[in-house]
C-alpha cells in the first residue's frame, strides 16, 4: 500500500477508509477520482489550507486524487469522500504513470512515488 505520510500511532478510528487505487466520489464538488496516495493528516502548507474555503478538519486522512475527465489533481479530506461503486475507469493522463492495471473497479498501484509538497 502506498502511504506517502501515514502514521498509524494516532487514536483508534483514524485508519483510512480508502487505499490507493480506490475509486471515490467527492460529495461537495461532485467529481469522480482515483486515490493515488494518502496522508494520515493534512500535510499541505498552512497558506494552502488557509486558502481552502471549506477548511475540513486537518486531523483525518487526506487523499491525493486524480480527477476523472481532466488533468487535474486534488487533495481532499476523507470526510468529503465516499466510495464510487460505478466500477468505471477514471480517465486521467497520469493513470498509466501511477497504476499497473484496472480490474474489478479498482486500480493496482505501482511503486511510483507521489511528489511531496
Where are these regions (language model features)?
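Structured beta-strand/turn binding interfaces of compact recognition modules in eukaryotic regulators
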Residues: 27, 36, 68
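Short, solvent-exposed secondary-structure boundary/capping segments
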Residues: 42-51
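Intrinsically disordered, low-complexity, charged/polar segments
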Residues: 58-117
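Alpha-helical interaction segments
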Residues: 38-39, 88
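Short, solvent-exposed loop/turn and secondary-structure capping segments
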Residues: 35-36, 77
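Phosphate-recognition beta-domain surfaces
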Residues: 54
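Mixed-charge, Lys/Arg-rich low-complexity intrinsically disordered regions
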Residues: 1-23, 29-32, 39-42, 110-117
Amino acid at each position: 500500500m502506498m502511504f506517502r505520510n501515514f502514521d498509524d500511532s494516532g487514536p483508534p478510528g483514524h485508519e483510512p477508509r480508502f487505499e490507493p487505487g480506490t475509486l471515490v466520489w467527492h460529495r461537495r464538488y461532485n467529481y469522480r477520482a482515483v486515490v493515488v496516495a494518502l496522508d494520515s493528516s493534512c500535510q499541505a502548507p498552512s497558506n494552502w489550507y488557509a486558502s481552502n474555503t471549506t477548511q475540513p478538519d486537518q486531523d483525518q486522512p487526506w487523499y491525493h486524487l486524480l480527477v476523472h475527465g481532466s488533468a487535474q489533481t486534488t487533495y481532499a479530506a476523507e470526510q468529503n469522500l465516499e466510495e464510487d461503486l460505478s466500477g468505471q475507469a477514471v480517465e486521467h493522463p497520469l493513470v498509466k504513470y501511477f497504476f499497473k492495471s484496472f480490474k474489478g473497479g479498482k486500480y493496482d498501484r505501482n511503486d511510483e512515488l507521489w511528489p511531496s509538497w
